[in-house]
Structures are given as C-alpha cells and as structure tokens.
A protein has these predicted regions:
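Pocket-lining segment of extracytoplasmic ligand-binding domains
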Residues: 55-151
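Immediate post-signal peptide segment of exported/extracytoplasmic ligand-binding proteins
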Residues: 12-23, 112, 199-201, 220
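Class I S-adenosyl-L-methionine
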Residues: 37-40, 80, 143, 193
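Short, glycine-/small- and polar/acidic-enriched structural segments
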Residues: 1-70, 89
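Secondary-structure end/capping motifs
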Residues: 112-198
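Helix N-cap/coil-helix junction residues
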Residues: 14, 45, 84, 148-149, ...
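Conserved C-terminal helix/tail region of periplasmic/extracytoplasmic solute-binding proteins
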Residues: 183-221
Length: 221
C-alpha cells in the first residue's frame, strides 16, 4: 500500500489529533510499536489514555469520549451502518511515512531462492492489479473464507482502495504496484529509532530491505 489505510476514528466533535487529548483511545497491542509512538511524539497524546482494542466497535459506540483505531476500508463502514457519526483521521494524510502490507522474507531465502521470491512478488502485484480491475472472483474467495463478509462491505472497501489510490497512487503510477523507495523507508526507520522500537547499533538500515526485486518487476496500474 502506497497510502497506509490505518486511521483513528473519533466521534464528530473531534476534528484533529490534538482534540484527542484526554480521550480514551482504543488501540491494539501491535500499535504500540508502530503508529502510537509517532502520535504521542507529534500530538502530545499519552499512554494513560490507552485501552486495549479488541476489534469490536461497541466500546467506542458506548463511550462518546473515546477514539478507536481502524482501517479506512473496514471500521468506518461498520460504524456508518450502525448510524454513528464519526470523523476519520488517516495517518498518511498527516505525514506518517510507513508503507502498509509489505512483504517480509528471510535474508537467506532471498539470497538462495531469489527467482522464487521474485515470482511470488510479481504474482502478488499482478493479483492486486487484477483484483482492482475485476474484484468479483476475489470477492467470492473472500466470502468463502469469511462467512460474515458481505457484498456491501466488499464494495465499500474496494471503492476506498480505488478512490484514494492506496495501492495504485504515488510512486506506483510511475514505478509499478508495490514499489518502495529508500528515502521513505529511511523515514520509517528513523521514526522507529527515535521511538526506541529498534536499536540502530543492532539493526543496520541497509540490511532491512531490498528494492532490487520490485524494481525489476514494474507491474504498472
């Protein structure tokens, strides 16, 4: 994803991240190592505000003084269906540098089976291109895997992916779906160092990524 779909969802009185000071904020455990340090540093939010997010919208609905994390393609739709008026703030609109849904692989695998890794990456990018052009076959498989998924939810999600060009926008227009840039990765790395999520003495930036494989694939939207 060139545009990270992660968001914070607030009740309609909240217009900015700064307005969330003093609110209860529901976030998942993994978020403490990703976007939460960035939000704390940039907007003055605190750990004292945090409560566990259980992927259930009811605690948010029941507490008008609360905020919850979500994906732009998911929770806002559920809240809309429940008749709850909200404001949705998307991190990528405010300078959060991270990509989303990256492909991770052991360094040894890349070194010893690069052709296999490249084929997997190409198939993944071609899959996204095919899905966005014609979501119907993919949606049938999604509904088989998740009996609670509806056509309406899927249509909403695909609509948001296309409207905001989350996968096909930005550098992907020129360099292909799934492209990554060293400068943007460095911004994410620096953020993690600043937040003490990683120790630069133990994790060398250059060892954390390669642009070689995706650069040669170039599946244009």
């Amino acid at each position: 994803f060139q545009k990270d779909p992660q968001v914070l969802i607030a009740h309609e009185d909240v217009k900015r991240f700064e307005d969330m000071k003093g609110k209860t904020i529901f976030i998942g455990a993994a978020s403490h190592r990703t976007f939460w340090p960035w939000l704390k540093s940039k907007y003055g939010l605190t750990d004292a505000q945090v409560r566990p997010y259980t992927f259930n919208i009811q605690p948010f609905i029941g507490d008008k003084n609360s905020v919850m994390q979500g994906f732009l393609t998911s929770e806002p739709f559920s809240l809309q269906k429940a008749g709850v008026k909200t404001n949705v703030l998307m991190f990528s609109d405010y300078g959060y540098p991270a990509y989303n849904a990256t492909i991770s692989c052991m360094e040894k695998t890349v070194q010893e089976r690069e052709k296999v890794v490249a084929a997997f990456v190409r198939a993944s990018m071609e899959g996204w291109k095919s899905y966005l052009a014609n979501p119907a076959p993919g949606n049938e498989l999604i509904k088989k895997a998740n009996q609670n998924m509806t056509d309406e939810q899927l249509a909403y999600s695909v609509g948001k992916l296309k409207e905001l060009e989350m996968i096909t926008g930005g550098d992907a227009k020129r360099d292909g779906i799934g492209t990554i840039r060293e400068e943007r990765l460095k911004a994410s790395y620096d953020l993690m160092v600043e937040s003490k999520v990683i120790d630069p003495a133990k994790v060398d930036f250059k060892s954390t990524f390669t642009t070689r494989i995706i650069r040669d694939i170039k599946v244009l939207p």
